[in-house]
Amino acid sequence: MSEKIYLGFDMGMGAAKLWGKPGGLQVVSQVANNGRGHLSDGIVGLRNRKRPMLVTGEFGSFYVGDGAHEHGRPVENLDFDRLTGAPEMRVLLYAALAQYEDEHGPFDDLLSLMVGLPLQMMTGDSAKDFQKGVRRWLMGTHQFDVDGISHIVQVEEVRQTSQPVGALFDYVLDDEGQMIGGRGSTLLDEVGVISVGFNTVELLVVKERGAVERFTAGNTVGVRRLLELINREGLWSLGELDSRLRAGRLNGEVKAALPIWSREVNGEIEKRWGLSHRRFAKVLVVGGGALLLKEALTLQFGHKAFVPNDPVLSIARGLWKLSVMKK
């Protein structure tokens, strides 16, 4: 029997992230309708701009990735329903899968996905419906074209957990799915996880391998909130601002808005954890926003704070490690 290919898939609102045995990648969550009214190349005096990936199929035709909002009409939807199979979520995954194949070779076996979802989709009355919707669109055969190249990918297995759980297992597991020496006992202690994503800041506390519900929550004060503080007049799409932020072209604006956003995030943490964090063995800080808030959060939690070497891809990497352990 052939070996399945295990992938961790972090369904982030800021980027779709994949991690497998050879490594990982992210595709920035910019999606735009392909208007097909392109400027011709070679306009004298203007530099030709590289187009983002073009993903097409029965779902439509979309530009995907960094710069997509400059080439078509932006599609920005931060509702959780998008993760249950909206066209913009499909094309993000397809772009990521195509890029993964470009970098590591074509998939020669069926895929097994360990999917990380926002905490809000894993709790509450709608949790089962959300999870069924995610599984429904991910399972089976996927046919799509990326930049004119046809792809067929088959997903045989879909398993789901919360995104902060991925961060926890990235910390305690090695690449073989085995406990890292000295960290296995962490699962018995109380460990806090702060995931600062594009849309949400999620808090999870685990004790004896189970979630402590009163310390677990998610709120929409992620990096988008910082961008909203910068973009009060609404002159830019969130995707355009995100690109400028990643390129280091918002340093002045970020310097002015960061203290406000930092206080809002700290307020949400304080509201849920209070002083109880002092008893936690570790506080893991992950997500793209961890790079922006690293100084503030490490100051708040002192030596207990742990920021991984790649906080952006930590969740996807941990999801992959978990899938290897559970195979």
List PLM regions with ranges.
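Nucleotide/phosphate-binding catalytic cleft detector across ATP-hydrolyzing
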Residues: 1-191, 213-223, 251-282, 288-327
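Short hydrophobic/aromatic-rich motifs at helix boundaries and adjacent loops
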Residues: 199-202, 241, 265-267
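A mobile "lid/hinge" subdomain adjacent to the ATP/sugar-phosphate binding pocket shared
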Residues: 223-261
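Conserved active-site beta-strand-loop modules that form the wall/rim of enzyme catalytic pockets
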Residues: 190-194, 199-205
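Glycine/GP-enriched mid-protein hinge/lid loop-to-helix segment characteristic of carbohydrate kinases
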Residues: 202-237
